[in-house]
């Protein structure tokens, strides 16, 4: 029984010491990986920020290039009376004489093309 204890005790001490060393190594590896991951995340974050800033600059340039006159003026929707001489129907609509309804109100309405 003593020989079993004598052989078991050094094996146990060796296993504990190696296990502790492995635990410390694992902890160090995890810290290194975490630091590498943080640096990678910082790099990715900076890259994404640069791309977003470039996109924002492009969008602001496009907005500043448009003038107020380039916007579509107010238009008349479908089925709304319009003036034959000055039709302000929205895009995709045409100022036409109605076929059935509206004959007695105004002579022209905005209809789809």
Curated annotation (Swiss-Prot):
Main location: secreted
Annotated compartments: Secreted
Propeptide segment residues: 22-74
Tissue-level expression: Expressed by the venom gland.
Signal peptide: 1-21
Disulphide linkage map: 75-90, 82-95, 89-110
Disordered, as annotated region: 61-83
Keywords from the UniProt entry: Disulfide bond, Ion channel impairing toxin, Knottin, Secreted, Signal, Toxin
GO CC annotation, single: extracellular region
A Pfam entry, by short name: Toxin_22
UniProt domain comment: The presence of a 'disulfide through disulfide knot' structurally defines this protein as a knottin.
Protein name: U11-theraphotoxin-Hhn1a
Species of provenance: Cyriopagopus hainanus (Chinese bird spider)
